[in-house]
Design a protein with these regions (language model features):
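Short low-complexity stretches enriched in small and charged residues
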Residues: 30-39, 54-61, 84
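Short small/polar-residue motifs
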Residues: 1-10, 49-50, 57-71, 85
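Residue microenvironments linked to proteolytic maturation
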Residues: 17-21, 29, 53, 66-147
Length: 147
């Protein structure tokens, strides 16, 4: 995990504390369960999404911050978020936790052998996790705001 400015515009955020950028999903790569998220799988969900919660380890009652930006790019589902939870912030900054994951409902999928191609998904939440199902779904930048 690198500590760096996320972008000049986003660095001017009024949020204090820890912010990160990373990928909650990576396209066209099988996860540990054999699911493959295809590019465009989140397009409709992002159009109709309200606020998507940022959770700790997929626990419904464990909101640890606020997602500031969600978008699909060529690589996957990009996330920029502010973390307000002190424990999660410490673990993120220390590099002890740096995985990302997402909760979802399948709208459209295709079975391909023992794998599933996820074509359209509803996005329920994004989580900071210790052990992501998609090993490439990681935080790639952390920003510590001055106090």
């Amino acid at each position: 995990v690198k500590e760096e400015a996320l972008t000049p515009a986003l660095s001017r955020s009024r949020e204090r504390g820890i912010r990160f950028a990373g990928y909650a999903a990576v396209f066209d790569r099988p996860d540990k369960g054999g699911d493959i998220v295809r590019k465009g799988a989140f397009a409709r969900a992002l159009e109709r999404a309200g606020e998507v919660p940022l959770l700790w380890q997929h626990k419904a009652g464990a909101v640890i911050g606020r997602i500031e930006h969600l978008s699909e790019d060529e690589r996957g589902l990009r996330v920029i978020a502010a973390v307000g939870d002190a424990r999660a912030s410490r673990l993120l900054v220390s590099g002890k936790v740096g995985g990302l994951s997402f909760g979802y409902r399948v709208r459209e999928a295709t079975a391909v052998g023992s794998q599933r191609e996820l074509v359209e998904l509803d996005l329920v939440e994004v989580s900071l996790v210790a052990n992501p199902m998609q090993p490439r779904a990681r935080v790639h930048a952390v920003e510590v705001a001055p106090s």
